């Protein structure tokens, strides 16, 4: 976001406004942390903010301050539509294009007459009236911190804002272990802790609250793990039947793909999850070094994200998707073999 846009937005938000804050479909820790962090900040500034998420988010994020005040577009449609239609501006957080909210909500947003403000760290964003896009940032939550800073309001940080932003940074950096984590990230984290983010409690709420069913599902996933050493690749599959047998709920597959990436010598990991409701195979990719799963997902699986973490989908069956994936591994063999951690 350039200085001119900051000044324009500061002027626009100088008086109380009705603001809607939107995260992407299937919200993760960064999306929920960013939307709720911005919600608390705008509320302290005297605005009337409303968070609208497209659908359900994981149970391990329900503790976040303000989460009970969010609207779900999929089953609180009338309230969501009313908030959107009455708003003076809509903030789009942690996604780069309107289709990332799902078809129904996208149709509503495309009819919106006022301005959008985008804050996001994914590649190739669409154009909106106000843009704060930085693909070098580890998370949208860190960008919300810097946005508050740019607005001259860093002194307004409190425990609610700090806890939300800490959560998103922690989850999107794999607990600060990914290459996107910088010294600046740690400085931001330190400031959030100084302003009330209880790091031990947040970590426990997110990572130490697994249901028995989730652990059983993890066991099933690890049992399905396949390693292809000739391609430095590992992948996991989960069918709808396997999910149902282990009492699957949204969020149970979060982070499982990282187990495949943790195998010694692996530079590309994937998880393929059957979703009968959407009639697709949902895919998460992770990589090490120079192999860009963002380009790979964009080109072959109608997805994208970051160079070392991205998502995609397939309209083929599980078996057909795996055949396609393995054929692509052969096509990308040289790149995979020579990928390295720089």
What are these regions (language model features)?
Residues 69-78, 132-136:
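Short acidic-hydrophobic, aromatic-tinged amphipathic segments that line or gate anion-handling sites
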